[in-house]
Amino acid sequence: MSKRVRSSLILPAVCGLGLAAVLLSSCSSKAPQQPARQAGISGPGDYSRPHRDGAPWWDVDVSRIPDAVPMPHNGSVKANPYTVLGKTYYPMNDARAYRMVGTASWYGTKFHGQATANGETYDLYGMTAAHKTLPLPSYVRVTNLDNGKSVIVRVNDRGPFYSDRVIDLSFAAAKKLGYAETGTARVKVEGIDPVQWWAQRGRPAPMVLAQPKQAVAQAPAATQTQAVAMAQPIETYTPPPAQHAAAVLPVQIDSKKNASLPADGLYLQVGAFANPDAAELLKAKLSGVTAAPVFISSVVRNQQILHRVRLGPIGSADEVSRTQDSIRVANLGQPTLVRPD
């Protein structure tokens, strides 16, 4: 299972405690009963979330759980840039051409029933997955390279935040792939085009209506532009503590990056990161959308090095406004005026 899933299978402990009959049934030699679905998720009615993650103590025959069915998504997808512990991720808007080989993990009881990153409810017996940069929702085929088994899952969550993991699957998906007991597996992840998937089966793709949007037709043109520009700011996403990535090691401040800049003119700051790589990535992206000089200014705050991504000097307030609009429309953050230091 994932590094955030550190507990071993907890079934023996449950059997020893002799709790409710529904739990004891998992320990008996008789075939386990299917759990009743409560509030849209699987599991017993008296489910109580454990403090540590692990496998469920109620059993379901995962061979009878169908794979996720790829559905076209005609509304907006969740692909906002977001920051985890100082590192900013820039999700893609289209998963259809995605291909990756790497390590998969899984997550279970601790997150069962909790909201996912796109607001859905995590069901450990659902066919879903978490990914750092795929759009939410999207669909991928995951193949276990050790045994050739494959599943289709719906990506609706963010994670895992460890450099050696490419995807986190639900417990059911991991069990169908044959690695729930070992915790991880080497997999191939392939994006799916839902329209093509349905066409290969000789059927038209179902029509999924987008969510209604608030009308802005009567709003002044400037207001409409601002509404579009501010639609997708960089998010600060705080995952559960068990998912946190390793802390960034202290680094030396590069004096060349902090070379003195002209004091005249106006300056914007778009982000501040503990991770210097995240700052460099944002700097590179900003350089592609604005003609204003982009630089990194590193300072120490509360015994931590922060790498601030800034623009300037900018000659006028009008130019500042245009630059801010360009950055917002590109979904690269919310630039704010700062004093040069």
Swiss-Prot record:
List residues of the SPOR domain: 260-341
Enumerate the UniProt keywords alphabetically.
Cell membrane, Cell wall biogenesis/degradation, Lipoprotein, Lyase, Membrane, Palmitate, Signal
| Main subcellular localisation | membrane
One cellular-component annotation, GO: cell outer membrane
Signal sequence coordinates: 1-26
Covalently attached lipid (N-palmitoyl cysteine), positions = C27
A GO molecular function held by the record? peptidoglycan binding
Record InterPro entries:
RlpA, RlpA-like_DPBB, RlpA-like_sf, RplA, SPOR-like_dom, SPOR-like_sf
Per the record, what is the consequence of mutating H131A?
A: Strong decrease in transglycosylase activity
The record's domain comment reads: The SPOR domain is important for normal localization, but not for cell division or rod shape.
Descriptive protein name: Endolytic peptidoglycan transglycosylase RlpA
Q: Which organism is it from?
A: Pseudomonas aeruginosa (strain UCBPP-PA14)
- Gene behind this chain? rlpA
